[in-house]
Regions:
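Glycine-rich beta-strand-to-loop/alpha-helix junction loops that act as flexible
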Residues: 71-72, 102-104, 245-246
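A glycine/threonine-rich phosphate-anchoring loop and its flanking beta-alpha core
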Residues: 8, 15-17, 23, 113-203
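ATP/NTP phosphate-donor binding region
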Residues: 1-98
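Short glycine-rich anion-binding loops that position phosphate/pyrophosphate groups of nucleotides
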Residues: 44-46, 104-107
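Active-site segments that bind and position negatively charged phosphate/pyrophosphate groups
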Residues: 198, 202-274
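Phosphate-handling active-site elements
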Residues: 90-96, 119-126, 255-266
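Short glycine/serine/threonine-rich phosphate/pyrophosphate-binding segments
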Residues: 106-113, 134, 251-252
Length: 274
């Protein structure tokens, strides 16, 4: 049975659906039934079978297009942003159309920012494929790109209209990417979710072995923690700053390593220790 969490205030609330497989016609098509065209943004690191699943659902139902970014933080750039915006313009997208972010945090961030700024805002859907993006970046509405002076310096707050979390995607993650996501999970346990802390402590082997039912509970508790905070403080003017625990040093560590050899989650873990 799917787990459903509602995030945000009445004027901007959206649903997060968590299950082994949320990529169904019922979930996706019912949400975009009034949309005319769809641009799927993904990257070269996302298994093609996931993209094919989305395309199969949209086939014969919606006019869709695909934009594939190069895998990695370097794609969260002004150049990639302009390329996507020009593609939307060339395809004559308007406010009756939407975007789908199929990938990790980089894909979600740049897609959300493009959606926020094209025609001053079109809808977008998050389909996160990594643990880190499932528990963190797909929820809360932060979208951004990087510039040479720093990470996430150009961006906006833009909530998705829907988040579909497939726990089965975690089966294909590398060990390094999976552990990176756990860094953000541990953060949520440390900033006040006692149930999540106990869940992690009591089920460490099951989590390590990627038992999906346990992982779905871990994801749910992580998102509940974030949801409560971002609903109260949508624009990071107060309590939301607690979500940056570990990130001040973490971002510096990532930048020092030129975003190579160390993942975001690993950097956050080190940042929390510091």
């Amino acid at each position: 049975m799917a787990r459903i969490i509602t995030v945000g205030k009445a004027s901007s609330k959206y649903s997060v659906i968590i299950a082994k497989n949320t990529l169904t016609k019922a979930n996706l098509l019912s949400h975009i039934k009034t949309k005319n065209k769809v641009l799927i943004v993904t990257d070269s690191g996302v298994p093609k079978k996931y993209l094919n699943e989305v395309k199969e659902i949209l086939k014969n139902k919606k006019k869709y297009y695909v934009h594939v970014l190069e895998k990695g933080e370097k794609s969260k750039s002004f150049s990639s942003y302009i390329t996507i915006q020009e593609k939307l313009a060339d395809l004559k997208f308007d406010r009756s159309d939407c975007m789908i972010a199929l990938g990790g945090g980089v894909v979600g961030d740049i897609t959300g920012f493009c959606a926020a700024t094209f025609l001053r805002g079109i809808d977008f859907i998050q389909i996160p494929t990594t643990l880190l993006s499932q528990v963190d970046s797909s929820v809360g509405g932060k979208t951004a790109i990087n510039i040479k002076q720093g990470k996430n310096l150009i961006g906006s707050f833009n909530n998705p209209s829907l988040v579909l979390i497939n726990s089965k995607f975690l089966e294909t993650l590398s060990e390094k990417e999976f552990n990176s996501g756990l860094g953000e999970v541990v953060k949520y346990a440390f900033i006040g979710n006692k149930k999540l802390y106990k869940l992690l402590k009591d089920n460490s082997e099951s989590i390590k072995n990627r038992q999906l039912k346990i992982l779905e509970e871990v994801i749910e508790e992580s998102i509940k923690t974030k949801s409560k905070i971002v609903t109260e403080d949508e624009k990071e003017s107060g309590i939301r700053a607690i979500l940056n625990f570990g990130h001040t040093f973490g971002h510096a560590i990532e930048a020092f390593n030129k975003y190579k050899n160390i993942t975001h989650g690993e950097a956050v873990i080190i940042g929390m220790v510091i």
